[in-house]
Amino acid sequence: SQTLMAGLGDNTEIEVFPYTDETRNEFYERLATADALLTAFVKIDANALDHAPNLKVVSINATGYDNVDLEAATKRGVGVCPVGEYCTWDVSESAIAYMSALNKHFKFYIQQIDEEHRWDYAAAPEYPRLEDQTLGIVGFGKIGKCTARKAKGLVKSIIANDPFIDKKLFGENGVTEASVDELLESSDIIVNHMNLNDTNYHYFSAEKFAKMKKKPIFINLGRGLSVNEEDLIAALDTGQLRAFGADVLYDETPDLEHNPLIGRDNVIITPHAAFYSSSSMRDLQVLSCQNIVHFLNGEKEKVFKLVNEI
């Protein structure tokens, strides 16, 4: 709020609305007079935008913005501004933590000690050292590259796939470019760092899992909708996947009581917390508020990241 007040003036009215699906109609009422909206995961579609005649900008305090209908926003002259750079270090650090924890059966041992009061290292299967394994990174943007830099001293080799980047970036970051099939077939550990777009909805499905010849550890730190969860569960049940880690699921409000991924000793799930640190939280709030200030003040060139043309 200090950033907003300083940039827009003391008369700026700021309202914090605790959104749930049950309060959506009330949310629409509040949108009626809003000039700017700051949110992370609330769905902003054409219907929502139709309830916001004064809205000029949607600032996303997250890197992803697939919750916003860009075409509808652009048609109505509403700018969409995510925060493109605030948690690269944190998410890549989480990737390394997942790799280590899943490879060394930490979840299994923790449950064994906490729930069974059992002290038996040999109860878990033997596992290969990270230094004997190949890491495959799907999505080689800022976070993917940062994960590769951190993993260099841990794994045998790193391969990556990303059709949207300059090919020279693979070599410059010490990794080998691989086709999708090559990566799936050759990797002992696969980390998904892709943003979600029209080309990768349910990207990881039965077809992709069947090509994972090494029965790898699979880690999803991209978006939940990149993975077909039914096919994922089948791959875990049949042993096609050795283990699974995720910071994102199909839904941002998952039914954890009935989710078949919960309770498995080879699955680790965190609540979309890979970005979370004191530094990232500070940067996230400041940058997302600065985006609003710059946009409303007509300083579009200063907006950290504007993803549609307004």
Predicted regions and their residues:
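N-terminal glycine-/charge-rich "phosphate-binding" loop or analogous flexible N-terminal tail
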Residues: 1-34, 159, 168
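Short beta->alpha connector loops at strand-helix junctions that form conserved
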Residues: 18, 61-62, 78-89, 181, ...
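Rossmann-like adenosine-cofactor binding region
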Residues: 45-48, 165-260
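Phosphate-binding beta-alpha-beta segment of Rossmann-like dinucleotide-binding domains, i.e.
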Residues: 76-78, 84-134, 146-149, 153
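Rossmann-like dinucleotide-binding domain for NAD(H)/NADP(H)
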Residues: 80-81, 215-310
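Glycine-rich Rossmann-fold phosphate-binding loop(s) that bind the pyrophosphate
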Residues: 140-141
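NAD(P)-binding Rossmann-fold cofactor-contacting core
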Residues: 153-171
